[in-house]
Amino acid sequence: MLSSLFPHRKFIRLDGGMGSMLQKGGMPVGALPEVYNITEPERIIQVQKQFVAVGSDIIYANTFGANRHKMAKAGYSVQELIAAGIRCARAACAGTEAKVALDIGPIGQLLEPLGTLTFEEAYDIFREEVLAGQDADVIVIETMTDLYETKAALLAAKENSDKPVICTMTFEPNLRTFTGCTVASAAMTLEGLGADAVGVNCSLGPDELFPIVEEMAKWTTLPLVVKPNAGLPDPVTGEYLVDPAEFAQAVAKFAQLGVTVYGGCCGTTPEHIKAAYDLLEQTEIAPRDNIAIPAAVCSASEVVQIDQPRIIGERINPTGKKRFKAALQANDMDYILDQAVQQVDAGADLLDVNVGMPGIDEKGMMIRTVKALQSIGGTPLQLDSTIPAVMEAALRVYNGKPIVNSVNGEEASLQNILPLVKKYGAAVVGLTLDENGIPKKAADRFAIAKRILDRATALGIPKRDVYIDCLTLTASAEQEGARETLEAVSYTHLRAHETKAN
């Protein structure tokens, strides 16, 4: 979708460092740049015109901090600041093919569990920005360190706009963000949620960003974005230390990773941007066709590849557990969390979460349980409910890429569950049963597995994210059924590999 804006471009050209350009032009430390959209629009337009002049295809509106938290004392509404910011960018792009991006940065408050801002409150703040920026051509979510906050922003963009969305996060040299998010978790989660391009901005200089982008390239099929700083500023003078020629040489190296969206962040001037684009025009960009993305799920901080048998702890489930039922009725979260800790300590790779029982608010309990589990550790979750509304509530507040447990061959299940899996970028367990129960024959179970997989892939769910469970009963009770299960597993596995080869 992003490439359709510039169908004949070898690569998409972003702009450079608006904030540092304004500071260089005399903006006082501590001033709110977004207010300049109204009080000194020509100052903003003049900077943006310089980036248009050197070939930038997308100009970021001066709206990075235009949210109700950061602008509480600005004297102008979010709507006024964003509308003025887009007008400035549009004026700078006049007479060219350059597009305008609504620029959305962090709120400036930490989300729970690190802070007090709830996911729902963050979503509402970002929704206000998106609605105010409907006149933009593109939405950019940038300089994020918290995957949970990025998810709130991306959902707000996808649910309230039809514009392409670019998401870039800020990483440390250890390949994690300030809040501990891994590169793989960011790439998987944001692609699953519907971003049109993902990458890295700010953080460090271009050389230091290379291993981060190299890692990201392993975990996403989306176009990759890189928008580095001009190195780090001199602690005495405040001047950024990487000059345009050095910046261009370093940025051009990203072509070997197949990066197709380039720009600059703090300290990058029109000279930096022009030098980089001139060199990139002479540089071959590696194709990223037929990328083999690993089958995996994640929390923000932990990735579990499904490349070997994995242990899923299933004790967070009231079925047959009198004490657990009592904990749910009493809202005893300490007991539930203790069950989680015990399972992780015993070697569980993932935790199944099922809080369904009569007499409680299952949706509310599921939300509280998922949030509580995320507050004590990073073990990825498998979300388990037979009620679609409960499943969606859990998917919405989960921070990462979970497994949905489960979908089956019944038409109602396929219609209700698979769209949720697609929207929230989850993996899913497919059970080989339908309205008639569990088929006795392996071939019939395979037929259901194929039906599930066909419906999933038709929605755009990657085949690697569908885990087929061929089901079985206790072997001592039904020995022939156990044999059929083994045959179904073998046949499904064989056909899956044949399809992959083709």
Indicate where each model-derived feature is located:
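N-terminal small/glycine-rich loop or linker at the start of catalytic domains
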Residues: L2-I38, F64-K70, E97-F119, K163, ...
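Active-site-adjacent beta->alpha loops and helix N-cap segments on the catalytic face
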Residues: T145-K158, G205-A217, T269-K274, I360-I367, ...
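Catalytic-face loop-and-helix region of soluble metabolic enzyme cores
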Residues: N174, E191-T260, L279, T283-E284, ...
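Glycine-rich, proline-tolerant flexible connector loops at the mouths of alpha/beta enzymes
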Residues: L32-T39, V52-V54, I58-L81, V138-K151, ...
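Conserved small/polar residues in nucleotide/adenosyl-binding loops
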Residues: T492-A501
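Alpha-helix-loop-beta-strand connector modules within alpha/beta enzyme cores
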Residues: Y76-T96, A153-C167, E215-P228, A276-I285, ...
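Active-site-adjacent loop and "lid" segments of alpha/beta metabolic enzymes
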Residues: V29-L32, A98-E129, C167-E191, I212-V213, ...
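Terminal amphipathic helices with adjacent charged low-complexity linkers/tails
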Residues: T268-A300
